From Swiss-Prot:
Chloride binds at R206, N308, R343. Pfam families: Alpha-amylase, Alpha-amylase_C. GO terms for molecular function: alpha-amylase activity; metal ion binding. Keywords: Calcium, Carbohydrate metabolism, Chloride, Disulfide bond, Glycosidase, Hydrolase, Metal-binding, Pyrrolidone carboxylic acid, Secreted, Signal. This is Alpha-amylase-related protein. Belongs to the glycosyl hydrolase 13 family. It comes from Drosophila subobscura (Fruit fly).
């Protein structure tokens, strides 16, 4: 009986720990993460203080923080080829990283680190040197900066069959040296690395290439991590938030369901379907059932996005900053509809798949610069600073925990809906105007359309919407308007 009771207790503790790893530890009503892709730590700290905190962003996903290989031309993907776990990259050193985390936490913006637990660097022609000056020999699987030797890796093989579990989880993803996470030494080093980041105050991790690691190995690693630190504003016994990259479009051997009990999982079907709809290939009327009815994960397990740093370079159905009108519309719907753990992208401009982030002649990352409207101008795109996006972050905060009500559509691709009595949004993706009197569910008054303008000192710089005593308002979105969206909420009342 004692053995049974003890085993049952362990199972309950494990289940509770896994459930806790779905909690992103946001402040107040904040509930949107932004990926500041390839930004420097000092610039992120300033962005937290000057923009993200005041605008109500919940957190930042940052690029990998540990030492990576130095590759000719400095392509973005060098950050995904680890050399050691020293916290020195082109984004900054450990002191700068720690300062960023502290300053962002102080203004209610959590930090989530992109971490690479699956692999180390691929083969490199010539001497492989990292961003901290550490030398390695990937060809012989020698990484003295950790240290790892050949026995810490799976035998080299390539992935040819994406329905072969062995190949997916033990062969080398695009030549990257595949760590054996079942080995005690590898587990210890990975846990030490993650615990060090926790000690510095991070709130959690994006786990790159999670499907290429056995879920039981990840369960052990996650379960061995320290609690988040109370001195950084986290409650006692808080577990790090885990969101895992698991690419699963259906019908594959390794599935997302193997990982969702361990933490949130990237919902890749979300971006496919939202891209398909907002490119005009699916009528918006079907979006009324958005979420699990579309085959998506349950909302609390799904990490959602319109695009990410990988797929925006791959073409296809994905929407990116290069199609700005549809991209803003899709992002507005993403942030208005109550489904998933939302992340928005903040990119740099690129012409080809391997383009480096903005850098100077010495190959040092450069800081973003801003025009008089606050938009980035020197190679950084900064979608999170587009009015149509940052104001929808505010909308999402204002309507948090309210349901979709009073759905309206025209039988095609003009839609509108309320979020309880807190907010209202209308979207027009037809080639003709939307001009309707619709139920907004809001108290009577005049509201600022946060898509076309900002509410500044009681005045709206864009369109205003008058709501009558019955909650109804005339809504107009022309087919050729600059934006195909209108959004109002209780915090945007004049």
């Amino acid at each position: 009986m004692f053995k049974f009771t003890f085993a049952l207790a362990l199972c309950v503790l494990a289940a509770g720990s896994a459930l806790a790893q779905h909690n992103p530890h946001w402040w107040g009503n904040r509930n949107t993460i932004v990926h500041l892709f390839e930004w420097q730590w000092e610039d992120i700290a300033e962005e937290c203080e000057n923009f993200l905190g005041p605008r109500g962003f919940a957190g930042v996903q940052v690029s990998p923080a540990n030492e990576n290989i130095v590759s000719p031309g400095r392509p973005w993907w060098e950050r995904y080829q680890p050399i050691s776990y020293k916290l020195i990259t082109r984004s900054g050193d450990e002191e700068q990283f720690a300062d960023m985390v502290r300053r962002c936490n102080d203004v209610g913006v959590r930090i989530y680190v992109d971490v690479l637990l699956n692999h180390m660097s691929a083969d490199f022609y010539g001497q492989a040197v990292g961003t901290a000056g550490t030398e390695a020999d990937p060809a012989t699987k020698s990484f003295p900066g950790v240290p790892y030797t050949a026995e810490d890796f799976h035998p080299s093989c390539q992935i040819y069959d994406w329905n072969d579990r062995f190949q997916i989880q033990q062969c080398e993803l695009v030549g990257l040296k595949d760590l054996d996470q079942s080995r005690d030494h590898v587990r210890t080093k990975l846990i030490e690395f993650l615990d060090h980041l926790i000690e510095l105050g991070v709130a959690g991790f994006r786990v790159d290439a999670a499907k290429h690691m056995a879920s039981e190995d990840l369960e052990f690693i996650y379960g061995s991590l320290s609690d988040l630190k109370t001195e950084h504003g986290f409650p006692h016994n808080a577990r790090p938030f885990i969101f895992q990259e698991v690419i699963d479009h259906g019908g594959q051997e390794v599935t997302r369901e193997e990982y969702n009990s361990l933490g949130a999982v990237t919902e890749f079907r979300f971006w496919q379907e939202i891209g398909n709809a907002f490119r005009g290939n699916n009528a918006f009327k079907w979006l009324q059932s958005w979420g699990t009815d579309w085959g998506f994960f349950s909302s609390g397990q799904a990490f959602t996005f319109v695009d990410n740093h990988d797929n925006q370079r791959d073409g296809g159905a994905v929407l990116t900053y290069k199609i700005p009108r549809q991209y803003k519309m899709a992002t507005a719907f993403h942030l208005a509809y109550p489904y998933g753990i939302s992340r928005v992208m903040s990119s740099f401009a690129f012409d080809d798949h391997d383009s480096a982030p903005p850098q100077n002649a010495q190959e040092q990352l450069i800081s973003p610069e801003f025009d008089s409207d606050g938009a980035c101008v020197n190679g950084w795109i900064c979608e999170h600073r587009w009015r149509q996006i940052y104001n929808m972050v505010g909308f999402k905060n204002a309507v948090r925990d309210t349901p979709v009500t009073n759905w309206w559509d025209n039988g095609d691709s003009q839609i509108a809906f309320c979020r309880g009595s807190k907010g209202f949004i209308a979207i027009n993706n037809n080639l003709y105007d939307l001009a309707e009197t619709l139920q907004t569910c809001l108290p009577a008054g005049v509201y600022c359309d946060v898509i076309s303008g900002d509410l500044i000192h009681g005045s709206c710089s864009g369109k205003s919407v008058t709501v009558g005593n019955d909650g109804r308002a005339f809504v107009s979105i022309g087919s050729n308007d600059f934006d195909g969206v209108l959004a109002i909420h209780v915090d945007a009342k004049l």
